[in-house]
Amino acid sequence: MNGLRKLSLMAAMLVCTTLAAVAQKPNIHILATGGTIAGTGASATKTNYTAGQVAISTLLEAVPEVNKIANVTGEQIVKIGSQDMNDAVWLTLAKRINELFSRGDVDGIVITHGTDTMEETAFFLNLTVKSDKPVVLVGAMRPSTAMSADGPLNLYNAVVTAAARESRGKGVVIAMNGLILGAHGAMKTNTVDVQTFQSPNSVSYTHLRAHE
């Protein structure tokens, strides 16, 4: 009987330890809108592709490491290329973000987005989100099926950024190719280069290294 009690006690302690570890991680919610990061092409070497084809659940399966950083959940808002972004989607995003933050159990939000209108979406949300919690936009210059897809690392870095306490009070930011850029100064400067987002008139917040 004593042996059974010890086993039960050990099991209970293990469960409590596991629950405590989970509770310590921030809760990050991803709102997916499509874009190149969710795009697919005919082969790994083809440059033509269709944006917004891959669901957020599939994108997250490709980056299991994010679960070591945060409790990550996701939902699909739309599946579009960002050239088709419009004010209706902007208003939907702003409303949903404010709803999520008002609940109190969401610590940060990541938005997967195409790069063509990412800076406009970031600027709009920077004006309409009523919280100092992190909102991070992320995308890719190469589709998910490309041999050298940049989406997985960008998504990982976006979750790292949204989960960081230091990101609070910084407004909406863009996390692309290791850079974190404020919504007020970020702009797309190249149609093919992965280092396309820059802040020529302001300083980027930081440069994320691969191991962070």
Stretch-by-stretch model annotation:
Residues 1-9:
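Bacterial N-terminal signal peptides that target proteins for export
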Residues 13-21:
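Hydrophobic h-region of N-terminal signal peptides that target proteins for export
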Residues 24-99:
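ATP/NTP phosphate-donor binding region
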Residues 31-33, 111-113, 136-139, 173-177:
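Short beta-strand segments
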Residues 112-132:
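Short Gly/Thr/Asp-enriched flexible loops that form oxyanion-binding sites at enzyme active sites
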Residues 138-204:
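Internal gly/pro-rich beta-alpha loop/helix module
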Residues 206-212:
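Conserved small/polar residues in nucleotide/adenosyl-binding loops
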